[in-house]
Each structure stands twice: as structure tokens, then as C-alpha cells.
Amino acid sequence: MDGQDNMKERLLVLSQRMARRKSPKQKKRTLYQLSEMFSALGYRVTLMGKKGIHGQLLLGGDPSHAKVIVAADFNLREARLIPARQQLLNQSANRRNQLDNLTVSLVLTVLLAIMGVLLCIAGTKQEGRWYLFVLAAGVFLLAFWQGRRQAAGNAGKNAAMFALLECARQYRKEPVAFCFLEETGTELGLRQLRENFPQAKLVYIHQLGREKARCVMLKGKPTRLQEALAENWPALTVQSLQENDDSLIRSWNEGILISTTDPTTMTCEMPGGKFDVQVDCDQIRQAVEVISGLIHPHRKQDHHRPEKQN
């Protein structure tokens, strides 16, 4: 049991660090560590992320034997590694993404028109009001950068989700669980995963979720989850997915959203990148136990040698 406690302690430390991971190297290291944690729990893991979904391009694990598939966020350059990526990205262009793109286009069009008017004014005046033109140009470039950043973020989330779906389909396996990091995935992608793999459980680790809380979402039998949560988290608020919550979370039926951090006890400074949160260690330890029991209940009692399995 000492080895299992050490593994849980490592997973606890990892979960505390994940919210502060910013650089690609740090995120990649976090993915490797998370893979080791699941391997220590006895699961065969496939890590999908920065190198695509085929063979040696995988960050870790063999997809033909994986029981847990971990998906991390992609960007536009990495999305090109996905087979039929354009078709997948076109399918993922739901109404929400279309509305976002339309809003960005309208903003850019208005700013371009304002810039043209200011240019005409500056050209007709002898003294000129070039500071207005410079200001408009700066706002235009800022809006353009934000639009490109938003489009890349949407495409990255969609690409990661559909790469996960494509990987599971290609190898014709029945994964025990899907694990998502950060904001990976879209409502449409989760719906397709649920339709194609209804037997799989969902573990959703969200560092900056609704109200900036650290959340874990589990999919399983509602009665069993309610009983387990009533025993392990008597003081926590367990919210049904029927509530008006984030669309990504609501899209997975029969799930439970567990907030392991009280929003009133945490601090978050945005958009400076500084993120500090006070985490209840006992709650995260209990969350690890519940995740282990739901994904592989038989190993909950007789998991005696995690070091050799890792």
C-alpha cells in the first residue's frame, strides 16, 4: 500500500502543477507524468498530443493495446498530421464556432472602414491627424491577432477531439476511458465519442473551468456515482449536468461534475498568466481513488505492485 500511496502523492503533486504549465516543454513533461500515473494504476495508456496519432509519432503508448486514451490540445500546425483533417475540421464547424468567426469578421470589417476614413481625413488636413490613424491601425492589428488566436484555438480543440475519435476508430478497440486535459474537445466531438463508444467512461481534468475551479468529470452509473460521492465528498456540491453549465460538460450525459476546489478559497489573476489556487489535498486524494475505482474496479482492492507495473 505504500507504493500506491506514493503514486497517489505524485499524482497529487502533478495535479497541483498542471494549472501552472505554460510552455510546450512543460506540458509535454506533464503528459509523460500523467501517463506514468495511469500506468501505475494498471492501465495501458495511449498519449495523444504534440506528435499526432500514428505509430512512432505517438508521445507514448501503443494504440493497439491502450485501455486509456489521453488527449491534449493541438494547434494548427499539429492538426495537419491528422488523416482527413480538413473534413474533420469542417464537420466540427458548429454554430458556435461559426458565430465566433462571423463576429471576428464583422469587427475586422468595421475597423478597416474606420481606418480608411481616418486615412482620408489625415490626407486632406494640412496638419493631419496621424495619431488617429496610428491608433486605428493598432486596434486593427490587435483585433486581427485576437481573431487569428481564437480561430487557432477552436481548430486545435476540434483537431484534438477528432484525432481522438479517429484513433479509437482506426484500431477498432473499446477504450475503458477517455481522459481530457485542459479545454480539449468540443460539444460535437464529445457527442460523437459518446455515440461511438458508449461503454467508455470519461475523465475530464479542467484547470480553468467554470469559475476557474479545478474540476473532474466522471461518466458512469448515476446511482453508483451518487453513492460514492455521498461517502467521499459529503461537504462538496455535486452538480447535475442538466444545469445550465458549460456546453462541453453538458454534452456528456449521465455524468457528474465534481469541483475539488472551492472558488471562494482561490485567487486568479488574469490575463497576466498568474494562477494560484489553494487545493484541498484530501479531496484530490479521494478523487484519485474514485477515478481508479470507476475505471477499473477490480484493481481497487488488489493493486499491490504499482512499481513493477510502471
Language model features with spans:
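Active-site-adjacent substrate-binding region
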Residues: S35, K201-L202, L208-N310
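N-terminal capping segment at the start of a domain
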Residues: M1-R29, S35, Q146-Q150, T260, ...
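A non-catalytic alpha/beta surface segment that caps or lines the substrate-entry region
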Residues: A19-H65, I82-I121, E307-Q309
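Structural motif
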Residues: A66-I69, K201-V203
